[in-house]
Amino acid sequence: MDKINAVITGVGGYVPDYVLTNDEISKMVDTTDEWIMGRIGIKERHILNEEGLGTSYMARKAAKQLMQRTKSRPDDIDLVIVATTTSDYRFPSTASILCERLGLKNAFAFDMQAVCSGFLYAMETGANFIRSGKYKKIIIVGADKMSSVIDYTDRATCPIFGDGAAAFMLEPTTEEVGIMDSVLRTDGKGLPFLHIKAGGSVCPPSYYSLDHHLHYIYQEGRTVFKYAVANMSDSCEAIIARNHLTKEEVDWVIPHQANQRIITAVAQRLEVPSEKVMVNIERYGNTSAGTLPLCIWDFEKKLKKGDNLIFTAFGAGFAWGAVYVKWGYDPKEDA
């Protein structure tokens, strides 16, 4: 019997209509467009500013487009995995809400929380469900409403993040394409350097936590930069070596869109030319679990069947890794 692997058969994406520019950010905090572009590489970010809408709204938009592009019916879907840090509620899962809003009757669903590395983890998890032979169509979504956890009086974090979502369809294949390998790692020593202190069981919501802005992202940028560059580079090197690829055989590197300086440093350490590195941070900012699939959403028409793609990310935890994908289809007319 031929070995079953999981192949990406389509992509869908969504970003909100409202665009928050650097000029607007500079009216909120002491910064400038020149500083943000020079230090972070972001020109604008999309924000979901309609009251009462959360991460599931963006996830539904992305998944709906994905289902249309792959001609998938609601009853075809077996599993939904949503990688997110900004779930609609503490419970139930955003994935369960998404199932209801897509009209999925035969699927089970769960959220995956690995912050900016969440989509990497979802890719490998979804692929293993496909490889089991029991599941035929799996939707994996990376979606975050980062504006809901940003302090817009904090100049260190508020220029960085945006809102967005994108989704992949995973299906079985016996061809030599698909999600080929992964290197995934976690090290809990990263907790002090990147976290949201309040809102969990250690520090439940209180007047104190609200007054002291403890429900927003805290980040020590220099430490995160150092660990991100080293670990993203190392995991890429490991997966390239393990799969006997040369640097020339790598067609695309898809790095988490955290900071342009991180992206550039990783590419330089890997000795990969800039034209092989997917970058869209200038338009979207850091959408956390959304960055990797949003890159594919933007660059899909440039991909060819058989292209070697290396996805890599780093996030709070610390959590990081790389996933090797051999792309499964040529450009589609409706993509």
UniProtKB/Swiss-Prot annotation:
The catalytic residues are: C116, H256, N286
- Signal sequence segment: none
Which chain positions lie within coiled-coil regions?
none
Q: Name one GO molecular function term.
A: 3-oxoacyl-[acyl-carrier-protein] synthase activity
Keyword annotations for this protein, in alphabetical order, are: Acyltransferase, Cytoplasm, Fatty acid biosynthesis, Fatty acid metabolism, Lipid biosynthesis, Lipid metabolism, Multifunctional enzyme, Transferase
Q: Where is this region: ACP-binding?
A: 257-261
Q: Which Pfam families match?
A: ACP_syn_III, ACP_syn_III_C
Could you provide one GO biological process annotation from this protein's UniProt record? fatty acid biosynthetic process
Q: What class of enzyme is it?
A: transferase
By sequence similarity, the record places it as follows:
Belongs to the thiolase-like superfamily. FabH family.
Its recorded name reads Beta-ketoacyl-[acyl-carrier-protein] synthase III 1
State the encoding gene.
Answer: fabH1
